[in-house]
Amino acid sequence: MAAASRPSWWQRWRRRAWARDGAKLLLFLLLLGSGPGPRHVRAGQAVEYLKREHSLSKPYQGVGTSSSSLWNLMGNAMVMTQYIRLTPDMQSKQGALWNRVPCFLKDWELQVHFKIHGQGKKNLHGDGLAIWYTKDRMQPGPVFGNMDKFVGLGVFVDTYPNEEKQHERVFPYISAMVNNGSLSYDHERDGRPTELGGCTAIVRNIRYDTFLVIRYVKRHLTIMMDIDGKHEWRDCIEMPGVRLPRGYYFGTSSITGDLSDNHDVISLKLFELTGVRTPEEEKLHRDVFLPSVDNLKLPEMTVPPTPLSGLALFLIVFFSLVFSVFAIVIGIILYNKWQDQSRKRFY
């Protein structure tokens, strides 16, 4: 059997070139398939779709200037090339960014890329920013630049401790609150009486990108963060039984007082999560019309007793006097009988 002829250098070079080109083509196809289309989340349990009508990223075309933009600016918020600045590092400023389109998704995930930085030293900066999913939009107020007694969900990145008992928690601090419109945010206690939970998050003046994710699936609220450059989500808040109506608006806001910071939003990306509900769960989880949390009693939710009317007060006093007189008469009768029996014993 004749020996096989060895390939020439040209044939060997062509084979190596084809191998390189094939690897490049495979890499190109993989990159092409990693765009904003659907992708599986958490071991294939759900598929998420980017919803552009509720998302915002660079270059922020038309934001704050075009009537056709999906986002509105409020207050001192400004559009820059690399971010949207809610407030500059100046005293007594407030700004907000609100989506114009109400969200009717059942299960969703909001990823927020933000940055908080400034010249202030330790405990001489503030106040932080908030991320909202609420019934009302574009309503300036004292709660991180938004209205008090809001209806919906608020997630707060609080950078300044107002309460004196600072040793109980380390700031900056992330917390969440669900409100039905009847609760006030307690600034003096950093929102502690009404918070669902929280965690420390060192997000100010750090060199890493800071991300926050709010995930709402089957009435289960999860808040996670990626703030240390490891590209891994860390749990912050986990709360089942959260009931949020559909048709509310996403937004973010910030406020400064005597202390200040730059509060920047780089991107907001909302994903619809599908494939997470069974047909039975679809029937069970009907729409709700007022935000609430199952089995959670908040101090401010207790209804104060209604004051008594004049007639009710009169009746209470009248019957109390009648009962007192009746008790005294009965007592006198019993006492007289006891005295009579005592005399009979002696005679």
UniProtKB/Swiss-Prot annotation:
Disulfide bonds join C199-C236. It comes from the Eukaryota. Ca(2+) binds at D158, Y160, N162, D190. Residues 336-347 are cytoplasmic. It is a single-pass type I membrane protein. A carbohydrate binds at S92, D127, Y160, P161, N162, H187, G257, D258, L259. One of its GO terms (cellular component) is endoplasmic reticulum membrane. It holds the Pfam family Lectin_leg-like. One of its GO terms (biological process) is protein transport. Residues 48-273 form the L-type lectin-like domain. Residues 1-43 form the signal peptide. It is found in: Endoplasmic reticulum membrane; Golgi apparatus membrane. Keywords: Disulfide bond, Endoplasmic reticulum, Glycoprotein, Golgi apparatus, Lectin, Membrane, Metal-binding, Signal, Transmembrane, Transmembrane helix. A motif (Endoplasmic reticulum retention signal) lies at residues 343-345. May be involved in the regulation of export from the endoplasmic reticulum of a subset of glycoproteins. May function as a regulator of ERGIC-53. PANTHER family: VESICULAR MANNOSE-BINDING LECTIN, VIP36-LIKE PROTEIN. This is VIP36-like protein. The gene is Lman2l.
